[in-house]
Amino acid sequence: MSKQNIDKSTEHSAGENALSEKNHTIESNKNNIDSEEDDEEDEDYDPEKKNEAENEGGVSSDEEEDNDQYKDGKTSKIPDYSTIESSTSQVKTRSQRLHEKLSNQSRFIGNFEVDSKTGLVKDQSNIDVNSIFENLKNGSPSIDNSEELNIDSEKTANSQQQQKQQSNIEENELQGPKQIKIQINYTFAGKLITETKYVDENSQEAKAYLNSTSNISSSNSNEDIPYRRSQVKVIRTDPVTNETKELRIKLKRPSLIDRFLSINGNSKKMKLSTLEKSRLDWASFVDKRNINEELKIHNKAGYLDKQDFINRMNSKRDDLYLQAKEKEKIRKQQLLQK
């Protein structure tokens, strides 16, 4: 037993010695590392060199770095933020659009702009009213400017009207004279004839057609339309009492198609007399040969023109006679009143 105790004690002492040696080596290594770091710091920082540089009038390295940064900031260009695109949407809500619309409407009264500060309509004229009022007070009115402005405005308005008239004339010349459609359905010499053509509005044929059709009724009167009853009277006898009873049975209402056919189906065709037909033929012949002006010149000495002239003179003489008669009555009444 004594030997075992001795062996255990020796082993324990040997382990403690090994641990102490390890701790000693670790502490020595730490001290060596700290000493090396202190040496490096001492080598980087030399206060004597710094003092010498300051005495010579130099600038320290920190100040040089600050100056370099300041110079770079001066020479650097101003950044351009216009190319930056925002990710936010520019869509307006309904309330924003309504508010913007109301604000724009409140700025105008009709076609006149309103001042936002005073709420009055802005003066859009170029006339200085205050200067004119002062000149009127002093007795030296200067209305030349206003007169010149009025003259200029009248000239511009007249020039615009002339330009419009010229443009309308040019358009009419390019488009040509206005044409009208002539469609005639008539019976002549026992035959049904239908003519459809386009003629100038100012032509003799168009005038003759309008004059001839004004005297002819192409539509039927209400008497030609057959009368349709809506109810029918029916008399029946009662077999028990032998009494007669009058019943009214409603008929079927005619449709719109039946009404249209009844009105247009029985319509009479337009009838032209030989005189009216010859007038239309003569007007078309005059337009084809372009002899309207020649006929006007030669017809001045004709019988019909002379009769028209005499009738005009007679009507004018009658008017003058009636006027003189009325004046005489008025003069007599005035004399009686006196």
From Swiss-Prot:
Swiss-Prot/TrEMBL keywords: Activator, Chromatin regulator, Nucleus, Transcription, Transcription regulation
Protein family (similarity comment): Belongs to the SWC5 family.
Pfam families per the UniProt record, alphabetical: BCNT
The protein's name in its UniProt record: SWR1-complex protein 5
One Gene Ontology biological process: chromatin remodeling
Keyword check for Transcription regulation: yes
Domain BCNT-C: 251-331
Biased composition (Polar residues): 83-93
Biased composition (Basic and acidic residues): 1-27, 68-77
UniProt function note: Component of the SWR1 complex which mediates the ATP-dependent exchange of histone H2A for the H2A variant HZT1 leading to transcriptional regulation of selected genes by chromatin remodeling. Involved in chromosome stability.
GO cellular component assignments: Swr1 complex
Region (Disordered): 1-102, 153-174
Biased composition (Acidic residues): 34-46
Superkingdom, taxonomy of origin: Eukaryota
Gene expressing this chain: SWC5
Cellular location(s): Nucleus
InterPro entries the record matches: BCNT-C, Swc5/CFDP1/2
PANTHER family from the UniProt entry: CRANIOFACIAL DEVELOPMENT PROTEIN 1
Subunit structure: Component of the SWR1 chromatin remodeling complex.
